[in-house]
Structure formats: structure tokens, C-alpha cells
Amino acid sequence: MADIKTGIFAKNVQKRLNRAQEKVLQKLGKADETKDEQFEEYVQNFKRQEAEGTRLQRELRGYLAAIKGMQEASMKLTESLHEVYEPDWYGREDVKMVGEKCDVLWEDFHQKLVDGSLLTLDTYLGQFPDIKNRIAKRSRKLVDYDSARHHLEALQSSKRKDESRISKAEEEFQKAQKVFEEFNVDLQEELPSLWSSRVGFYVNTFKNVSSLEAKFHKEIAVLCHKLYEVMTKLGDQHADKAFSIQGAPSDSGPLRIAKTPSPPEEPSPLPSPTASPNHTLAPASPAPVRPRSPSQTRKGPPVPPLPKVTPTKELKQENIINFFEDNFVPEINVTTPSQNEVLEVKKEETLLDLDFDPFKPDVAPAGSAAATHSPMSQTLPWDLWTTSTDLVQPASGGSFNDFTQAQDTSLFTMQTDQNMAETEQALPTEPQAEEPPATAAAPTAGLDLGLEMEEPKEEAVIPPATDTGETVETAVPTEGAPVEEAEAEKAALPAGEGGSPEGAKIDGESTELAISESPQPVEPEAGAPQVIPSVVIEPASNHEGEGEHQETATGTEPREAAEDVAAQGSAGEKQEVATEPTPLDSQATLPASAGAVDASLSAGDATQELPPGFLYKVETLHDFEAANSDELNLQRGDVVLVVPSDSEADQDAGWLVGVKESDWLQYRDLATYKGLFPENFTRRLE
């Protein structure tokens, strides 16, 4: 008996040695290896199928454990409700019955899932271990087959052939081949069939789970509705004991998670003692309040850092009242709310820069809608003045169609023949070289002397385009007729150069002043006299950057003519005289006028290059990093062109829609490069 066991053990050891030797030779490349690529693919699919089935079994067991936990939790909940239920309350027995039936439903649902799905899954996975063992055994038989084949080939190729050994090797080879074929054929049939059967198994399993769950929820919904009706009737029975949650949010809803980083806090620099004469710091205002975000859409923009502490030297100069004017009156400005959003730091002035000329008009800065009074009207009591609060639209056509400017309101009156005669006598035959031509407009010639001028009802407003500035006024002196808009540009030519036939010759002067441009000539109505403005020449002022306007002129007059006009205005006739400082060199007038035309044309082209629906420009004060694809990435100092927002909710939350000016000038694509950005990160530009 011991000999038999020893023989079997020795035989198994010999097989293991032969297999190990064969594998080593195959790894070293000294012996060929039989391979079946199709069978190897079947083995890979089998391993994948086994892993998927094992995971499904694990998750189903977890699902059943959760059902068991829900059963216990539901039972404890209904028991606690039954314990707190008072005997005199409505539906005490119904509550107990609902709890018991719910427990039965949970138990039935759990048991059916175990019987219909879990046991089936266990049976499905039970066939994998046997097939796995057969695959491993086939691999061993394949090594034995290769070893017997190599041994037979070695004996047949040797020089000294031993027929007995060769015949014995052939028998061993045929035996190994037969055993390998048995395992190989069976697995070649079973593995593809098992791989295909997984689809039907998954279908049956999840159909069973879904049908059982649907039936369970349908039955338990009836019990839940029953419990709801009991609670409703109990509430009606005790209506005077209603319960309300105090302090509960009314608009609590899911918000869009948009984590937008706030800009980094910038440390406020300590002001030096020499920065301000009184060493007083301006109080730091708190950060702007984060706007309310629209519900269920987008949170408001991030909060910018606190403003830097600045010395009191940066006080606005417009708050200082000038008491040194001859006609001191408070200035009345009518501005729109949008203009108050951006504070402009005005240029500081000294007493040496003040102009004490009573004929100098108070002119509002370019771009504002302020309505000021002419100097001639300042002789009246200040409480009798009128202020125009209407915003004047820009005149269309010509080189001025892209600018808007507030026009001085003035009253025109007719001049008598005597005034005309005095004005013509005061005209010099030759302009003085040291007195540069200054332009002014006043309706003096070509008017019917029997009619009085009415107050203009409409005014065409044009801002200055260059340093010298140009202002074109139009007024129709007809009775009750609307004022037609007229625009003209001044071109002052030196003596000896030709002019257009539209210029008026004065007392045999050889110099003619031509009107270079007239985009919209005056179209007077029937019976209305034609207005030909005269010219008043004033000495040039050295005040640079005061923002005064020049009016269109067709001739030149000395300063004495302006004084005569002022004397007539004080006698009861109202007239507007506007002066503008000009360079001392009269030869520079023509290049300045040409530059004004070029500047206005370029400004018109710039307006046409703005995106559709353009509202205004803003400058970024802080860096902003976009948290979503529909937001802009902004750096400090970027200029953004604001366009109307598609969503009122985003606008109410403090977001604006716009496109970076650099992207717009480069790509001209508003739909691709526009995006949202926080309004409180920017400041508005005029």
C-alpha cells in the first residue's frame, strides 16, 4: 500500500518537474509554445464576466441590507407616533394599523427580492469556479502536450535512434494530446455560451427588481395617503393649535454654485505728512454691499476690496465757490443720474487764471447736459432766469454727428438801423497782426427791422472737436415757427487767399472768409427773414483748457462792436455773444480748423465701430477671474464696452454684460467674446 502511494507521489513530482522544465525552455525561447488566441480571448471575457457578476452580487446584498434597515426604521417611526398619540385624538387605531401594514410590506418586499434575484444571482455565479478550474487544468495539459511533443521530436532527430524509446514517446504524446483535446473542446463550447448568457441574466434580474419595487411603492403609497388623511383630519380637529416656524426663509431655494473668488485685499498705504497740509485722512468708506442674487440662477458678484485711505487734498474743486466774479451767481447744472456716477477731478485754478471779462459766457464742460446762462442774461435778477433741463440730441449729418454739447440759452432781439450803422463804421479795413481773429455770432444783418426775435424753441448742440472748439448756433426769428437745425464750420483765411462767394464783403476788405462746411443749411419758412450773423472780435485769452466754445463767424469786427452790442443788451434787448481763446498767431487758424474736421470725422468712425446696443464704457478697478464659461476674465485697467443684458435677473443681481474693448477692436465678434462681469468691480467712464 505504501509502495502504491510512493509511486503516485513520485509520478506527480515527475510531472511537476517536466512542466517546470518546459516552461523555462519556453521562456528562454529554446522551445516553441502552442497558443490559441481565440481561446485566450474567451478566457479574458470569462474573467470580466466573473468580476461583473461578483460586484452585482455585492451591491444587491447591500441593497437588501438597506431595505431591512428601512423596515426597522419605519417600524420604529410608526411606533413612536403611536406612543405620542393621545387617546382622544382622531385616528389613533388607524395610525397603528398603517404602521403594521407598512412593516408587512417591507418584509414581503425584502423576501421576494431575496428569492427572485439574490438566489438567481448566486446560482449564476456558482458555475464560474468549476469553469475556472477547468481552464487552469487545460493550461497544465497544454504544457504536458508541448513537453511530450518536444521529447518525441528530440528522439526522432537524434543520430542514434532507439525504436523502443521512440515508440514509448509516441504513446505518451498521443495520450497527452487526447487529454488536452477533451478539455479544450469542452471549454471552446462553454465559454462563448456563458459570455452570451449574461445579457439575458441581467434583463431577468433587473426586471424582477424593478417590478417588485414598483409594486411595493404602489402599495405603500396607499398607506401613506391614508396616514396623510388622518393627519389632515386631526389638524382640522385642532385648528386653533396651528404650528408655524418663525424665522424660516421665504425664498430659500437651491442656488447655483458659482464660486467666484474675491479680489485680493490691497493694503492701504500710510499717507505721508507732506501729502496734506492738515494731515487729516479721509474716512474709509465700507465695501459696497453684495447685491442680492436672483433665486435659483446666479449669485451676486464678489465684493471688491476696501478703498485706499487718501488724504484730504483730493477735494472736488467744484465745491469751492468763486467770489471774485463780477456777476457772482450760483451756477445751476441739470445733469442726468448717469453723469453723477463718475466723478471728474477738475483742473485747479488760481486767481491769476480768472477772467473778469463780463462778456465771457459760463460754459458747461463738454459731454455734460448742464444748461448755463449767457453773460448778457446775468444782468437780470438770478431768480428770474430760466433753465433748460432737456437733453439736447446731436445734430445729424456732417462731421458733427457724433458729438453732443449743451447749448447756451439766450434771447435774440432785432437791431435798429442805427446799430447796424455803428457796427459797420467800427469795422477796420485791415486786421491787426497782434490781434488774433476771435469768432462770435450775433444776428445783425439781413433781418426785418419791424419784427422782434422770439425765444428759440430748439437748439442744435455741437461739442468742440479740437483745442479751439467750435459751437454752432441756430435760431429762427419767425413768429411761433419751429427752429431748423443749422450747422457750419469756421475757416479763417489770411488776407490774399480766395474765399467762397457765400462770404460777406465788409467796407471793401480784400479778405473773404469762406464757410468750409455747411452740412445742414437753414431752411427758412415762407415769410421768415434770413439770419446772417455778424462777428465780434475779442482779444485772445491765455486760459488753456477752460472748455469755452467758439461760434461760427462769417466776418471780423473789432472789440468796440462787442461793447456796443453789450450796451444795447442792457437797454432791454437780449443778445448772446460767445468768445473763445485763440492762439496768438493768426496763421494757425486754418490748420486748427482742418484738425477739427479730421478729429470729428475720426470720432464719427469710432462711433460706428462700437458694438450694437452699446450703452457706455467702464474701467475695471480690480482683477476678476471668471468662475463660469459665460463670464469675462478681467485685469485691472481693462476697458469694457457695456451692452444690454439678456437676463433681468443677472442685471438685478449686480452683473453687467459687455465685451472687452481690445477683443472688440481685434475680432468684431460680440456673440463670442461678450460675457458677464460684476458692476461693483468697475467704474463708469464718460
Curated annotation (Swiss-Prot):
Region: Disordered, residue numbers: 244-314, 421-441, 483-597
Coiled coil: 10-83, 144-191
Keywords assigned: Coiled coil, Cytoplasm, Cytoplasmic vesicle, Cytoskeleton, Membrane, Phosphoprotein, SH3 domain, Synapse
Intracellular or extracellular location(s): Cytoplasmic vesicle, Secretory vesicle, Synaptic vesicle membrane; Cytoplasm, Cytoskeleton
Stated role: May participate in mechanisms of regulated exocytosis in synapses and certain endocrine cell types. May control the properties of the membrane associated cytoskeleton.
Keyword Calcium attached: no
GO cellular component, one term: presynapse
Membrane topology designation: Peripheral membrane protein
Record-listed Phosphoserine modification sites: 252, 262, 268, 272, 276, 500, 629
Annotated SH3 domain residues: 613-686
Ranges for domain BAR: 24-240
Bias type Basic and acidic residues, positions: 541-562
Modified residues (Phosphothreonine): 260, 280
Composition bias, Pro residues: 261-274
Organism: Mus musculus (Mouse)
Complex formation: Heterodimer with BIN1. Binds SH3GLB1. Interacts with REPS1 and SGIP1. Binds AP2A2. Interacts with AP2B1. Interacts with DNM1 and SYNJ1.
Protein name: Amphiphysin
Biased composition (Low complexity): 424-441
Biological process annotations from GO: learning; synaptic vesicle endocytosis
